[in-house]
């Protein structure tokens, strides 16, 4: 489903390049010290979002979504707000990784989340719903 609230959204083929660094499910499990089933459960519970990328179409998660402690705490609520606006998972990923010069930090909404601007990102996510 296309969403006109995503500025200059790239095609699905460009999602892999837009996000940049991805972690496969096994790599993510190793990084977090979790079993593969536990990593998959994070996706089912929408603590993380992923996409099939690469030449082998492997389910992967953007590396910016996790730190040493696990999934970034601001992500699930942001996923919910964007999902409530009827964005698909690929559209949510595009929105989070598309650069926005009007943010309080340089980069994309994911960079603003990483810098601690969760409220600002969620406000913009709510605006994208309308």
Identify the residue ranges that each predicted region occupies.
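Non-transmembrane "mature" sequence context
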Residues: 1-130
């Amino acid at each position: 489903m296309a969403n006109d609230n995503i500025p200059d959204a790239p095609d699905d083929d460009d999602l892999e390049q837009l996000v940049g660094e991805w972690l496969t499910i096994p790599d993510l499990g190793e990084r977090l010290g979790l079993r593969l089933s536990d990593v998959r459960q994070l996706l089912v519970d929408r603590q993380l979002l992923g996409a099939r990328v690469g030449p082998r179409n492997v389910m992967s998660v953007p590396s910016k979504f996790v730190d040493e402690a696990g999934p970034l705490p601001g992500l699930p609520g942001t996923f919910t707000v964007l999902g409530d606006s009827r964005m698909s998972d690929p559209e949510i990923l595009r929105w989070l990784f598309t650069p926005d010069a009007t943010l309080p930090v340089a980069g994309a909404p994911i960079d603003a989340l990483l810098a601690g601007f969760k409220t600002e990102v969620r406000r913009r996510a709510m605006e994208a719903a309308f």
